[in-house]
Every structure is written in structure tokens, then in C-alpha cells.
Curated annotation (Swiss-Prot):
Role summary: Involved in cytoplasm to vacuole transport (Cvt) and autophagic vesicle formation. Autophagy is essential for maintenance of amino acid levels and protein synthesis under nitrogen starvation. Required for selective autophagic degradation of the nucleus (nucleophagy). Also required for mitophagy, which eliminates defective or superfluous mitochondria in order to fulfill cellular energy requirements and prevent excess ROS production.
Name of the protein: Autophagy protein 5
Membrane topology: Peripheral membrane protein
Main location: membrane
Membrane-spanning ranges: none
Keyword Ubl conjugation belongs to the record: yes
Source lineage: Eukaryota, Fungi, Dikarya, Ascomycota, Saccharomycotina
Pfam family, one: ATG5_UblA
GO annotation terms (biological process): cellular response to nitrogen starvation; cellular response to potassium ion starvation; cytoplasm to vacuole targeting by the Cvt pathway; mitophagy; piecemeal microautophagy of the nucleus
Species name: Candida glabrata (strain ATCC 2001 / BCRC 20586 / JCM 3761 / NBRC 0622 / NRRL Y-65 / CBS 138) (Yeast)
Length: 270
């Protein structure tokens, strides 16, 4: 896992997004409702909603600013919570329970999603009311929680300036790893109190099932084997067999593979 930090950071997923006909003026053919973009694994899909809508601005039923709080993404009629990093969402719904690298024949080259709207908002999706600033605040709030788990207090995040917070966010949106990590490394301790981990049920469901244990820094395999019902987990698109990590500390895995919200996201049969 030597170069895994930047390899994961530079990873991206090809996405085709089909807009709900209710977002568009009448008579738009189905082919014109499609938008193709590439979304970084280490990002939130909601960051790209303004770009998706901008591509079809000329045929939108309303102004982009009016639509943003009313839309969300779905996959096979399952609403996707943007609050989970995009790479993790992809892994949950695309074969993590079988082992992502187990069969290239079944590998999805383009993830096909829908951008939908309805009168009733799904309970597992946070409405975007304050635009991109809401996403930035959400990410820093998540880091505040993780800082408490790691250090026993949130002081390291609380002491960050607004400019520091903006640099973290700009690092994510501008794909500048140096800018992002320059601030984040000030939050991480040499010796953690506990480790923030989010374990997701493989293959998802109407609502992603997630357990968030705060684990002590034992070996990686020892820390998670009592929670999962498989001999491997998936993290950042990597299939990790527990037997291979009996001598690797959980914090070492966390340090290399934690996501932009501060959590180490693992996907497994629960």
C-alpha cells in the first residue's frame, strides 16, 4: 500500500447520468437527457450536480439554483446518499460482496445513474439547501467527529482557521492533493486513541446499512473480523483479505486509505 494515498486520490469513475423528464421542458428526446462525466472516487457526487445541470441548461424546466435543493441521484430506483464518498458508493453497489477484482467480465466501465426529483425527498439523502458551502461544512463537521475519535477531543479541527477549511475543500474540488493533505495531516495523531471506521453492507439496498464502530488500534484483521461475515473487505476499490493483514495495524491501513470525510470506509457482508 506504499503509494495508495495518491493512487486512490487520482482514481475516478466514468458516470452517465440520465435526467428525470420532470426536470426538463416537454419534448426532450431521451438521448438528450444524458450527461457523461468523470467523478473522482475521493469526492461527493453532489459537488458535480451544478455541472450536470449546466450541461442541459437550455432545456431545463427551471433555473439551476431553483432545482438544486430538489434533486438527488438514484441507481436502479435506490436513492444514493451523497454524504458517502463516491468511490465507496460505487463499491457498495457494484460487486464488493463478490470481490471487485474477481471478474473483469462483470466490471462496470460506466456507472449509469439517474438525477431525479419528486415531491417526497428520500430519508437517506440530505437536501442541498446552501449549495457548495453546505458540502464544505458537512465535510469539516465529519472531520471534527473523526478528530474526537482519533485524539479524544476535537481541538485540532476547532483550531483550524476558515482559510484552512477552505484549503481542504479546494483540495477536494480542484483535485489538489498537496493542498488537501497539508491541512489534514495536522489533524492526525502519531498514536490514535481510537480509529473512526464505517462498515457498509455489501450490495446496498434501499438505504445503505452502515455501522460506525470506533475501533482500538489492534491488527487490521483482528479489529474487523468480529464484525464482518466474510474473509475479505473492500476498501477504496481494493479487495483486502483479512488473513493478509494479521501483522498490519488498523491505523496503518487508516492512514493510507481513509477517505475525505475522515472515516475508513469498509464494505463487507455484515
Amino acid at each position: 500500500m506504499g503509494d495508495s494515498k495518491e493512487l486512490v486520490w487520482n482514481g475516478s469513475i466514468n458516470v452517465q447520468i440520465k435526467l428525470d423528464s420532470r426536470l426538463l421542458v416537454d419534448g426532450v428526446p431521451e438521448g438528450r437527457r444524458l450527461v457523461n462525466i468523470r467523478v473522482p472516487r475521493e469526492s461527493h457526487i453532489a459537488i458535480y450536480t451544478p455541472l450536470v445541470l449546466e450541461r442541459l441548461r437550455n432545456v431545463l424546466r427551471s433555473d439551476i439554483e431553483e432545482l438544486l435543493p430538489k434533486v438527488w441521484y438514484s441507481y436502479k430506483d435506490i436513492s444514493l446518499p451523497w454524504s458517502i464518498p463516491f468511490g465507496t458508493l460505487f463499491d457498495i453497489y457494484n460487486g464488493a460482496h463478490k470481490g471487485i477484482s474477481g471478474s473483469r467480465d462483470n466490471y462496470i466501465n460506466v456507472w449509469k445513474l439517474n438525477l431525479v426529483t419528486d415531491e417526497k425527498f428520500p430519508i437517506n439523502v440530505i437536501p442541498i439547501i446552501e449549495g457548495q458551502d453546505q458540502l464544505r461544512k458537512f465535510m469539516m463537521q465529519s472531520w471534527k467527529q473523526c478528530c474526537f475519535i482519533l485524539n479524544g477531543s476535537s481541538k485540532r479541527v476547532m483550531s483550524l482557521s476558515l482559510q484552512d477549511s477552505l484549503e481542504v475543500w479546494e483540495g477536494v474540488t480542484e483535485r489538489d492533493y498537496a493542498k488537501y493533505s497539508g491541512v489534514i495531516k495536522r489533524i492526525l495523531p502519531r498514536t490514535p486513541r481510537r480509529i473512526p471506521v464505517a462498515i457498509h453492507a455489501a450490495n446496498g439496498g434501499p438505504i445503505v446499512q452502515t455501522t460506525e464502530p470506533t475501533l482500538t488500534d489492534t491488527s487490521f484483521s483482528q479489529a474487523v473480523e468480529g464484525i464482518v461475515k466474510a474473509d475479505f473487505v473492500v476498501c477504496q476499490g481494493i479487495v483486502m483479505y483479512l488473513r493478509d493483514f494479521s501483522d498490519t495495524s488498523l491505523y496503518d491501513v487508516y492512514d493510507k486509505l481513509h477517505s475525505i470525510d475522515g472515516y475508513l470506509h469498509l464494505i463487507a457482508n455484515l
